[in-house]
Curated annotation (Swiss-Prot):
Organism of origin: Homo sapiens (Human)
Family, similarity comment: Belongs to the anoctamin family.
Catalytic activity line of the entry: a 1,2-diacyl-sn-glycero-3-phospho-L-serine(in) = a 1,2-diacyl-sn-glycero-3-phospho-L-serine(out); a beta-D-galactosyl-(1<->1')-N-acylsphing-4-enine(out) = a beta-D-galactosyl-(1<->1')-N-acylsphing-4-enine(in); a 1,2-diacyl-sn-glycero-3-phosphocholine(in) = a 1,2-diacyl-sn-glycero-3-phosphocholine(out)
Lineage: Eukaryota, Metazoa, Chordata, Craniata, Vertebrata
GO terms, biological process: calcium activated phospholipid scrambling; chloride transmembrane transport; monoatomic ion transmembrane transport
Any one GO molecular function term: protein dimerization activity
UniProt key word DNA repair: no
InterPro entries with a match to the protein in the record: Anoct_dimer, Anoctamin, Anoctamin_TM
Name assigned to this protein: Anoctamin-7
Gene name of the record: ANO7
Amino acid sequence: MRMAATAWAGLQGPPLPTLCPAVRTGLYCRDQAHAERWAMTSETSSGSHCARSRMLRRRAQEEDSTVLIDVSPPEAEKRGSYGSTAHASEPGGQQAAACRAGSPAKPRIADFVLVWEEDLKLDRQQDSAARDRTDMHRTWRETFLDNLRAAGLCVDQQDVQDGNTTVHYALLSASWAVLCYYAEDLRLKLPLQELPNQASNWSAGLLAWLGIPNVLLEVVPDVPPEYYSCRFRVNKLPRFLGSDNQDTFFTSTKRHQILFEILAKTPYGHEKKNLLGIHQLLAEGVLSAAFPLHDGPFKTPPEGPQAPRLNQRQVLFQHWARWGKWNKYQPLDHVRRYFGEKVALYFAWLGFYTGWLLPAAVVGTLVFLVGCFLVFSDIPTQELCGSKDSFEMCPLCLDCPFWLLSSACALAQAGRLFDHGGTVFFSLFMALWAVLLLEYWKRKSATLAYRWDCSDYEDTEERPRPQFAASAPMTAPNPITGEDEPYFPERSRARRMLAGSVVIVVMVAVVVMCLVSIILYRAIMAIVVSRSGNTLLAAWASRIASLTGSVVNLVFILILSKIYVSLAHVLTRWEMHRTQTKFEDAFTLKVFIFQFVNFYSSPVYIAFFKGRFVGYPGNYHTLFGVRNEECAAGGCLIELAQELLVIMVGKQVINNMQEVLIPKLKGWWQKFRLRSKKRKAGASAGASQGPWEDDYELVPCEGLFDEYLEMVLQFGFVTIFVAACPLAPLFALLNNWVEIRLDARKFVCEYRRPVAERAQDIGIWFHILAGLTHLAVISNAFLLAFSSDFLPRAYYRWTRAHDLRGFLNFTLARAPSSFAAAHNRTCRYRAFRDDDGHYSQTYWNLLAIRLAFVIVFEHVVFSVGRLLDLLVPDIPESVEIKVKREYYLAKQALAENEVLFGTNGTKDEQPEGSELSSHWTPFTVPKASQLQQ
C-alpha cells in the first residue's frame, strides 16, 4: 500500500521506519543497515527473491543511514517504571510517550511480557540429548527476541535470580510508528467524534417510567464514552479524535492486540517448518508465559483525601467482581474497555440470559407449588395410597418379587408434583420464552456490536490465523478486501472434515456403549438389591439402581468430556480453518455434538425409551439376556426429574467448586513455587517486586469455551426437559447468580490479563441455542404426549368419569392367564392391553390423540415463534439510524481527497515534491523468511 506523504504531518514522533519482514506480517527494521543486510541475505536464498533484494539495496543506498527506530538504549537507562498506560496521565506519561516515539533516553512502558525460566542446576545434570534441546530452545528464544527488536519493538529484559533458577522477563512495548502502521494493517476502528454514553437496560427504563427506585443500578465511575468511529488510516490521522496525544490515542487493549499480532506472526526459525509465532513457543515450552500486564493491584487503596485514583482493574473489582454486587447491573462498557469485546460479550450474554431466567423461575416455581397443592386433592393418587392390597403388581425385574401398588404411595405423590395440567402450560410458556429470549438477544447483540465498533468484524476486519498463514500452501485474493491472503483449498478441507466426522461418530458410539452399560448396570443392580434379603432395600431396589446409575453416568460424562475436548482440538487444527472465528466455530460444533450425546443420552433414554419395549408378563423383551427396564412405580417422569437434578445440579456444583478451588490452588502453588525459590536465594520477604512478577504469579486465562459450554448445556436442560422438572429454571438462576461473580472474580483477581480479542457476536453458540430451542419444542411435545399422564387423564375425563374415579384401575392391565397359571397367582401391570397381552382399542385411541397433540403443539409454538420473529426486528431502529449517521460522518471525514491532493488525486496517491518521500510501500517489504532463522 502507498501512503500519502502529507499524512505524516500530524505525527509527533520520529521519521517513518523502513519495514523488513513479510507482507503478511508487516514488521520493521531498526535501520537501513539492517534492511541492507536482509536484502543481501535474501539474495543468496532463492532466485525469486533476488529482484526484490537488489531493489532494497538500491533504495537503501539512496537514503541516509540514520537510525529510524533506536531500540538499543544505554544499559544504565534500560531499567525504569513499567506498567500499564492506565496511568499515562501521571508524571510517567511523558516518559511513556517518549518511549513509544522511539527515544532511547526515557524509560518505557511495558505493554506485553514474555517469561521463561532456566534451572541452572538441572542444566548441569542433563544428558546430551536434553542439553541439545535446551540449547535449541535458547537459540529459538534469542532469534525470536532479535526479530522482535528488528520489528521495531522495545525489548527490555529483567532477570530475577531465585537460587538455582533464573526467571527471565522480556518487557515489550511498541513505538508510535509501529502502533500506527498496525492499526491500519489490522483495520482497527478508532474514534472520529465523541457521543454521550447512552447505555441502558430495559428494566431500568421500565422502573423509571413506573417511578420505582431501581435497586439494580450501580453508579460506576469513569464511564467510557461512545464514539462515532471508522477504520484507521494513517494519512487521515489528524481527523481522528485524540490523535494529538500519543499517550492515550491507542488504548491499552488496542496496543495489546497489535503486539499480540506481531508476536503471533514473528518467526523464530524456518517458516516451512512452522517455527513461527508465540503459540508454538508456548506449546514447545520455549516460553513459560506471554501476557499483557494488568493495570495494577485489584485491591482498592484506603479512602481519604490523598487516596489515588482507582485504576481500571480496581474499578471492576469494586463495582463488579465483589459478591456484594450480585444484584447490580454489570458495567459492560468497563469490562469491554479492560478485557476486550469477546469477554464483554460473554458477560453480556450471561447477564442477559440470567435476567430472562427470572420470570421462567417464578412461573416454574408457581407450577411446582400448584403440584404440591394437587397432591392432596388428586383422586387417582388417593386411590393408590388407599388401595392397600387391592392391586398386586407383577415383578419389575427377573428375580424381583410381586409387590403391592400401595407401597409406591410416596413415589406416586412425588410424581404428581411434576405431572399435572400446569406442566402443559409451563412447557408452552418455556417454548415461547426461549424464542423470545433469542429474538431479543439478537437485538441486544446488534446494539452492543455497534456500540463497540465490531458490527462488520468477521466480514472485513478479521485476519487469517497465524498458524493457518504459516501452513497454507498458496495465496488467493480475499473476495471482500481484494488483498492476497494465505489460502487452503476448500476441497482438501472438506476431505479433512469428513475424516474428522468419522472420529466424531466413533466417539458418539463410545457414549452410546457407555449408556448401554449403564442400562445393564441398573438392571443387574436391581436384581442384586432385590436378592439382598433386606425387605426395605428390596422394596426400593428399582429406585436404588436408578439413583446409583445416575451417579455412575455423571462420572462417565465428566471423564469422556476431558478426553474428547483434546481430541476435537487436534482435529480442528488439522482441518486448516482460515480465521480464528471459523476455527472456534468448528471446534465448538465438534465438542457440542459430543457433549450433547454425552449429557443428554441418559435423560433421552429415560424420557422416550425406558418402559416402552418391555413386553408383558410371560413375554418380556431382553437386551443381552437381561430383561428391559420398566419405569418405577411412580412413573418415568419422576425418574427423569431425578436424573435431571443429579446431572444438572451435580454438574453445576462440581463446576462451581472447580472454579473456586482450582484457580486458587494453582495461584497458591505458583506463588509458593516462585517465592520459596526467592527465600532460598536469600531475598527478603518484604522486598518489592515488579508488576510483571506479580502478574506471573497469577493463573493463565483458560478462555471462554468451557464457560459458554456450561451455560449452553444448562439452557438445554432448562428447555428440552422442562416438562419433567419445572424447578430447572430456578436452579439455573441460582447457579448463574453465583456464576457471574465467580467468573468476574477469576478474570479480575486470579487470571493473568488475557489479550483483548474482538468479536461481533457469541458466534456459533447462538445457532446452537436456536437449534436447542427447536429441539425443545419437539421434545416437550413428545414428553407431554407419551411420558406424562396428562393425555390419558384427559381421555378418561372425556370418555368415562370427569372426577377421575376409577382412573387407576383403568391404567392397569391383567397378566395373561398363562403367566398366572405358571405362578399360581394373578397380577397387574401398567399398560393398555387385553387379557391376552394384545394392545387394546384404548391404546390405539390414545396413540392417535398423542400424535395429534404433538403435531398441534409444535405447529402452534413454531407459528407463534415465527410471528414473533417477524414482529421483532433483529436490529433496533435506533441502532440503524446511528449506523447511517456514522457512515455519513466517516464518508465526510475520509473522502476529501480533492482538498488534500488536488482534483485528480486519489486517497492513496502521493503529491510530487513532498517533503517526506514515503518508503512505506509493499516493495520495501521482503519475505518473512528473510528474518533470522
